[in-house]
Amino acid sequence: MMKQRISIFLLFTILLSANGYAQKAIMRLTQQTLMHEVRETPSPLDGQHITVNPPRFMWPDKFPHLGAVLDGVEEEDYKPEVTYRIRIARDPEFKSEVITAERKWAFFNPFKLFEKGKWYWQYAYVDKDGKEEWSPVSHFYIDEHIRTFNPPSQQEVLAKLPKTHPRILLDAKDWDNIIERNKNNPEAQAYIRKADKCLNHPLKHLEEEIDTTQVVKLTNIVQYRSALIRESRKIVDREEANIEAMVRAYLLTKNEVYYKEGIKRLSEILSWKNSKYFAGDFNRSTILSMSTSAYDAWYNLLTPDEKKLLLRTIRENGKKFYHEYVNHLENRIADNHVWQMTFRILNMAAFATYGELPMASTWVDYCYNEWVSRLPGLNTDGGWHNGDSYFQVNLRTLIEVPAFYSRISGFDFFADPWYNNNAFYVIYQQPPFSKSAGQGNSHESKLKPNGTRVGYADALARECNNPWAAAYVRTILQKEPDIMEKTFLGKSGDLTWYRCITKKALPKEGPTLAELPMAKVFNETGIGTMNTSLGDTDKNAMLSFRSSSYGSTSHALANQNAFNTFYGGKAIFYSSGHRTGFTDDHCMYSYRNTRAHNSILVNGMTQKIGTEGYGWIPRWYEAVSYTHLTLPTTERV
């Protein structure tokens, strides 16, 4: 008991000692922001020493585009088509051995390793008359011991893409083997049971299902549209689960009854697009996702009219998403819904219809190159700046997209170091049976790791052969063996299908969580946790903190220099408020606001909401008996 008290005391003294230490080596930043909502500087920067070979090249849009504020509140702003050119060489005059490219978006992947030394690069905007507007010449360095990560080019990937269907949810050549492997798999049988229930429950029209009793009372147009979309999504998401179950039931059995009922049900859903209750990019992406799954899985059974219907739906919705993304997504600090789901959905639609829908080739080009350029994480430390709850909305994308690329190309996309770093984020931000560390919107709802988080850790363990992720999974499954079943068919995070088709096994039992360091800081993301007993949640005292260069943009909160404390997996000194929306008074003044968190109000002033209200973690130290960190003074309004 005495050791526990000492440990808890040490955790609390970290914050008390931080200011005194900071006086010895003061750091001052004067920039208004460390991050741009929309890119304002090129990458690589002039004089930069590159961290990965080959480098990824990105530059500001000629016509910067912020996009809609909220889902369903779209704006018809001007975003013209553009053309860019780029050149890269060893000499600043670009006279010999020049790498050149022309792109319709503001990024370029060379897909070739660069020799060590100094390189020069430059980009240009090309107007409609062909006139080039070149940027200043920048230089960068490729150092001797640089890390390499060089995925295959788009052309190499497409050369290996199967021309048969199905090819998205599974590869046709492995189909019979997958059926055989899953005959006695309880998770596979869950799809069949779900599909069988749908056979006996006819579908009603959207207007008969949606509950608008509360929506009609709202007078604010933003709140009205937001509430209407939430209610319609409940119905659309429910039906998405039904269609996806019937698609997978067919793939697991080849029983055509699931196709016949499924296409009938899907045809009704597709008629909802003209309803006044149907709006928002999540609903549109759901339509695109269902149509893609049905087209690819039932391709050999579809009638000509059914194929036309699905291809038309894919074309109409895919075109809208592509137009929204191009010259927007690549230069945004983050785009919530796109990273969470809609990018994955457009990517799968593109590869499913490549060679059969002319514009799919452009979608493939954009999506694949965008993933290589910026994803999976928006930095390298494995953290998630949007917080733990919204991290979990990205889980299917983080696994299914690279798993698909790896399957068709033979290249291991999970070899990106971000994934092994992210395994530590999963563990430290929410240890087994513990409440979330408390960052980002809806953090308060994450009382303990749920099935999607455990399923994601399971996939990381398999794909990366990561012993720590495997230990996390085994620790939780010992007490909750059915935890992954509880999130079956979850829209954004369920990885049941991944487990049904993968041949990769969970690593053999190895080290335990007790062998991990007690503290972990993700300094690029600006978060960290300290623990006393990671291997035993009941006895673990934990402190979490945040001071982030991302500020409070997106789903992040205005909680720079804030901390939370926990014991036995339960919150002791914790943030207040509840996620009630994105724009309501409680959210803005008593949830996202600094006063809802364990930080300091300087002269009663709260932190700015946006990238301007930033912090950072200048340094931290960890030893056997203590951990020490230094936090900055926070930007205020």
Q: Which sequence ranges carry the predicted segments?
A:
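Catalytic and substrate-binding regions of extracellular carbohydrate-active enzymes
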Residues: 486-629
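Aromatic-lined, polymer-binding surfaces characteristic
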Residues: 182, 191, 224-430, 435
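Recognizes extended acidic, P/S/T-rich segments that occur
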Residues: 78-114
